[in-house]
């Protein structure tokens, strides 16, 4: 049965069970395309927000009867129709002859047979409102279209064992169906999105039959580049006005408008006339051209320009205070007019000073400073390759350390403790009013001494850590080397920022007039940046120290050839590799080091076939996200140890128990109990929870038993995963700070981690190759999804309270729940079908 323009309201929420089924929420208005589609009794083909799919007919209710099509000259009866759609906030497009101007919107006659007209999104710039939409509808759109149109993070709703958004499509930009192509007449007088200036009218006789918008032609309309035609004062701010293009006599300029407003290429004739030697300056970095070269502007302007001297005198509108580069005289002399891109020899873009973007650096997002394009050589860490190149082994910096494990650990802990005490000494001078003139005048010498010591102690620590990294590079397995390299990179990035800011402070001679601030300001200066980055150094150093000390037996081996090491710690204190810290720092007693080291669990002996487990470290803030890495095909004991270590890292119940509310504390305790449930692998004690039908004779009895056994395991841990996701979405919806939702995300990671481990274990035990491949692929997909979630969570914490970053984290976690459900279903299907 076919019907046109049939509308239905959703009576219940609908969770799709297949790809063809349409997801909707209670109260949604659907367009019914076909009832009992394809011979399926009770299933209707409907459309919602541009998506088509089948829906169960008993979950929707028809609003009106079918609307019969009428010829173009007939006039439909709009009365009841308008009343019904007015209640649903939809727009019924009437015939052009029967439109009521009081209650409906005027739509061109070409839409008279299109039925329900749903307003598309704007085609122009975001500032332009192409269609006038009532305020109530605009609020509805903003509240239901997700984070792109509202500032609130949209979290999906749990229905059964899955999650459904209020609107199913992610990042859905087109809320309404876009109407079909327009008729032959122009409808809207709106310029395209690239034209940001005023609309230029075109004579009526030049309108093309197929044109929809009144757009000026590309040739012969503008006397100057289009971007220079912006009359509004707001659009002219911080833009550059270039002189008009040069044309040959009788030939129009056909060069299209480019990305930058630069004069078009000159012709040979005009180029020869303009071959005048003068220093050319970078746009955006010079004084006004006419002020410096008025003689050229007034007396040497060619006739082809067709402009007066007054026009030329204000050719450039340049912001002040920016340095510039001048092209050498030889360059302009040797350059031929044919080889130039334009009238003026414009040098390459001079990178802006990095201090403007350094203002946003704080203690968490401290690495953004190293990628701001600074022109200073010692801060050129703007790419991953340059960062990694700084860690490349060189004979002078990263030479191997020939130390025995006890001596290396003793030296490492001494350097770490010295560094922590230096940072604590600096932090003790930072108070609420420490930047006021009176405080700075009394303590500026102490602050300067503390800053110098922090930089010195961090440099000494880095020297030792790079040597340990060089030792790790010689191991047969590079897993430990890669882990140490990531941890060392964070410390080295901090050292680069501290070195640069300390250098800048010394450049200004620690002037009180510069450093003393009597009133609060939004920008961060060099001293603020130094303090904020220095706060993060002890945690990063502690994480690296723990990794090195845990694997000291692997990294360090005594070298009998080095006689200066035979005498133990006393000789290493006098060796050239050790730099004595300040005498005021008192390190721990060597016995304390050994006691502290032996109190930590050491890993079993490593072999070539067993890579070191890199998940064990005490960690610093966010360290569990930075260090998260799943090692495939690991044993049950290693997996459980890794789970326990990840759970203990930044345990919020131990760190901030007094700051948590009662319901938060109980929620964390409940989740921790679920997470600690082990993954069973003893199938002899297992009893099937239900008898599963078997129709697949190709699967062996043993493989089927394994699939059913681990399916029950998946069912248990999948419920724990859903509970962890519910808790995460709840704290995101209530706008909890990063320390709360990061802690919740760890429970999500650990729960899904168990599903990956189940897949790896099953891969090793099943005999059928096709089943092994399917399980491995599903497990690998889950593992990659976990890494994506870790990165998304880290970005959400770094950019908090960015709605976009939080929404991306929510989307990734939602995808994880779907992939986990598919993984669980695949085990059941392989066992029963």
UniProtKB/Swiss-Prot annotation:
<dbReference type="GO" id="GO:0005829">
    <property type="term" value="C:cytosol"/>
</dbReference>
<dbReference type="GO" id="GO:0051301">
    <property type="term" value="P:cell division"/>
</dbReference>
<feature type="modified residue" description="Phosphotyrosine">
    <location>
        <position position="91"/>
    </location>
</feature>
<dbReference type="InterPro" id="IPR035746">
    <property type="entry name" value="NEDD9_SH3"/>
</dbReference>
<dbReference type="GO" id="GO:0005925">
    <property type="term" value="C:focal adhesion"/>
</dbReference>
<feature type="compositionally biased region" description="Basic and acidic residues">
    <location>
        <begin position="331"/>
        <end position="343"/>
    </location>
</feature>
<feature type="modified residue" description="Phosphothreonine">
    <location>
        <position position="803"/>
    </location>
</feature>
<dbReference type="GO" id="GO:0030336">
    <property type="term" value="P:negative regulation of cell migration"/>
</dbReference>
<dbReference type="GO" id="GO:1902952">
    <property type="term" value="P:positive regulation of dendritic spine maintenance"/>
</dbReference>
<dbReference type="GO" id="GO:0036064">
    <property type="term" value="C:ciliary basal body"/>
</dbReference>
<dbReference type="InterPro" id="IPR038319">
    <property type="entry name" value="Serine_rich_sf"/>
</dbReference>
<dbReference type="InterPro" id="IPR036028">
    <property type="entry name" value="SH3-like_dom_sf"/>
</dbReference>
<feature type="compositionally biased region" description="Polar residues">
    <location>
        <begin position="564"/>
        <end position="586"/>
    </location>
</feature>
<comment type="similarity">
    <text>Belongs to the CAS family.</text>
</comment>
<feature type="region of interest" description="Disordered">
    <location>
        <begin position="297"/>
        <end position="316"/>
    </location>
</feature>
<keyword id="KW-0472">Membrane</keyword>
<keyword id="KW-0498">Mitosis</keyword>
<keyword id="KW-0130">Cell adhesion</keyword>
<keyword id="KW-0333">Golgi apparatus</keyword>
<dbReference type="InterPro" id="IPR021901">
    <property type="entry name" value="CAS_C"/>
</dbReference>
<feature type="region of interest" description="Disordered">
    <location>
        <begin position="560"/>
        <end position="623"/>
    </location>
</feature>
<dbReference type="GO" id="GO:0007155">
    <property type="term" value="P:cell adhesion"/>
</dbReference>
<keyword id="KW-0965">Cell junction</keyword>
<feature type="modified residue" description="Phosphotyrosine">
    <location>
        <position position="222"/>
    </location>
</feature>
<feature type="region of interest" description="Interacts with CTTN">
    <location>
        <begin position="350"/>
        <end position="833"/>
    </location>
</feature>
<feature type="modified residue" description="Phosphoserine">
    <location>
        <position position="368"/>
    </location>
</feature>
<dbReference type="GO" id="GO:1903829">
    <property type="term" value="P:positive regulation of protein localization"/>
</dbReference>
<dbReference type="GO" id="GO:0061098">
    <property type="term" value="P:positive regulation of protein tyrosine kinase activity"/>
</dbReference>
<dbReference type="GO" id="GO:2000522">
    <property type="term" value="P:positive regulation of immunological synapse formation"/>
</dbReference>
<dbReference type="InterPro" id="IPR014928">
    <property type="entry name" value="Serine_rich_dom"/>
</dbReference>
<keyword id="KW-1003">Cell membrane</keyword>
<feature type="region of interest" description="Disordered">
    <location>
        <begin position="237"/>
        <end position="258"/>
    </location>
</feature>
<dbReference type="GO" id="GO:0061523">
    <property type="term" value="P:cilium disassembly"/>
</dbReference>
<feature type="region of interest" description="Disordered">
    <location>
        <begin position="326"/>
        <end position="403"/>
    </location>
</feature>
<dbReference type="GO" id="GO:0032956">
    <property type="term" value="P:regulation of actin cytoskeleton organization"/>
</dbReference>
<keyword id="KW-0963">Cytoplasm</keyword>
<feature type="modified residue" description="Phosphotyrosine">
    <location>
        <position position="213"/>
    </location>
</feature>
<dbReference type="Pfam" id="PF14604">
    <property type="entry name" value="SH3_9"/>
</dbReference>
<dbReference type="Pfam" id="PF08824">
    <property type="entry name" value="Serine_rich"/>
</dbReference>
<dbReference type="GO" id="GO:0030027">
    <property type="term" value="C:lamellipodium"/>
</dbReference>
<dbReference type="InterPro" id="IPR037362">
    <property type="entry name" value="CAS_fam"/>
</dbReference>
<dbReference type="GO" id="GO:0005634">
    <property type="term" value="C:nucleus"/>
</dbReference>
């Amino acid at each position: 049965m076919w019907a046109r323009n049939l509308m239905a309201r959703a009576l219940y929420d609908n969770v799709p069970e297949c790809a063809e089924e349409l997801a909707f929420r209670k109260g949604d208005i659907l367009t019914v395309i076909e009832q009992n589609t394809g011979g399926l009794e009770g299933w209707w083909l409907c459309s919602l927000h541009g998506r088509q799919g089948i829906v169960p007919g008993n979950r929707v209710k028809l609003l009106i009867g079918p609307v019969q099509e009428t010829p173009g000259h007939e006039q439909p009866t709009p009365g009841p129709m308008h009343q019904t759609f007015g209640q649903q906030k939809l727009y019924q497009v009437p015939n052009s002859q029967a439109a009521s101007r009081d209650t409906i919107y005027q739509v061109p006659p070409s839409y008279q047979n299109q039925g329900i007209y749903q307003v598309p999104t704007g085609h122009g710039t975001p500032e332009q409102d192409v269609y006038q939409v009532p305020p109530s509808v605009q609020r509805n759109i903003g509240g239901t279209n997700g984070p792109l149109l509202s500032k609130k993070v949209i979290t999906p709703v749990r229905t059964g064992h899955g999650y459904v958004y209020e609107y199913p499509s992610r990042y859905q930009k087109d809320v309404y169906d876009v109407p079909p192509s327009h008729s032959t007449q122009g409808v809207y007088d709106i310029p395209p999105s690239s034209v940001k200036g005023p609309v230029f009218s075109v004579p009526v006789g030049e309108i093309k039959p197929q044109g929809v918008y009144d757009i000026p032609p590309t040739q012969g309309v503008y006397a100057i580049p289009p971007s220079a035609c912006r009359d509004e004062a707001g659009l002219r701010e911080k833009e550059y006005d270039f002189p008009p293009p040069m044309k040959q006599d009788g030939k129009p300029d056909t060069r299209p408008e480019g990305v930058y407003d630069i004069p078009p290429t000159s012709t040979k004739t005009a180029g020869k006339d303009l071959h005048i030697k003068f220093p050319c300056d970078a746009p955006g970095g010079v004084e006004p051209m006419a002020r410096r070269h008025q003689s050229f502007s007034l007396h040497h302007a060619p006739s082809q320009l067709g402009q007066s001297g007054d026009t030329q005198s204000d050719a450039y509108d340049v912001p002040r205070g920016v340095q510039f580069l001048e092209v050498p005289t030889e360059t302009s002399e040797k350059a031929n007019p044919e080889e130039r891109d334009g009238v003026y020899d414009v040098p390459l873009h001079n990178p802006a000073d990095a201090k403007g973007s350094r203002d946003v650096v704080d203690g968490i997002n401290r690495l953004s400073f190293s990628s701001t394009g600074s022109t200073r050589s010692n801060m050129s860490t703007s790419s991953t390759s340059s960062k990694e190149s700084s860690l490349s082994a060189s004979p002078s910096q990263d030479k191997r350390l020939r130390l025995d494990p006890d001596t290396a650990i003793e030296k490492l802990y001494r350097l770490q403790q010295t560094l922590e005490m230096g940072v604590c000494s600096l932090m003790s001078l930072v108070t609420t009013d420490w930047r006021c003139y009176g405080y700075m005048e009394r303590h500026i010498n102490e602050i300067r001494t503390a800053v110098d010591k922090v930089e010195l102690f961090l440099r000494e620590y880095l020297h030792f850590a790079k040597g340990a990294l060089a030792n790790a590079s010689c191991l047969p397995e590079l897993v430990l080397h890669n882990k140490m390299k990531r941890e060392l990179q964070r410390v080295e990035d901090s050292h680069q920022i501290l070195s640069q800011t300390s250098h800048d402070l010394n450049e200004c001679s620690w002037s009180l007039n510069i450093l003393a601030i009597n009133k609060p300001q939004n920008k961060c200066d060099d001293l603020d940046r130094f303090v904020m980055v220095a706060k993060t150094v002890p945690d990063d150093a502690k994480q690296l120290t723990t990794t090195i000390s845990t694997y000291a037996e692997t990294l360090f081996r005594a070298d009998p050839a080095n006689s200066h090491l035979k005498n133990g710690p006393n000789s290493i204190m006098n060796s050239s590799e050790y730099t004595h810290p300040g005498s005021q720092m008192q390190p721990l007693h060597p016995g304390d080091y050994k006691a502290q080291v032996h109190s930590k669990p050491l890993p079993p002996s490593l072999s070539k076939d067993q890579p070191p487990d890199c998940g064990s470290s005490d960690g610093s803030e966010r360290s569990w996200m930075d260090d998260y890495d799943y090692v495939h095909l690991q044993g049950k004991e290693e997996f459980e140890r890794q789970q326990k270590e990840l759970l203990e890292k930044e345990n919020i119940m131990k760190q901030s128990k007094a700051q948590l509310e009662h319901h938060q504390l109980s929620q964390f305790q409940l989740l921790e109990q679920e997470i600690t449930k082990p993954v069973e692998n003893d199938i002899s004690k297992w009893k099937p929870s239900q008898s599963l039908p078997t129709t697949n004779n190709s699967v062996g009895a043993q493989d089927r038993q394994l699939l059913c056994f681990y399916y029950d395991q998946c069912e248990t841990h999948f419920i724990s995963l859903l509970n962890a996701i519910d808790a995460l979405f709840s704290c995101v919806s209530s706008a909890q700070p990063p320390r709360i939702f990061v802690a919740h995300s760890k429970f999500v990671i650990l729960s899904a981690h168990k599903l990956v481990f189940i897949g790896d274990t099953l891969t090793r035990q099943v005999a059928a190759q096709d089943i092994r491949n399917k399980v491995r692929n599903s497990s690998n997909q889950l593992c990659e999804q976990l890494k994506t979630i870790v990165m998304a969570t880290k970005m959400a914490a770094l950019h908090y309270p960015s709605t976009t970053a939080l929404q991306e984290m929510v989307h990734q976690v939602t995808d994880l729940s779907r992939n986990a459900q598919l993984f669980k279903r695949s085990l059941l299907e392989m066992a029963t079908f």
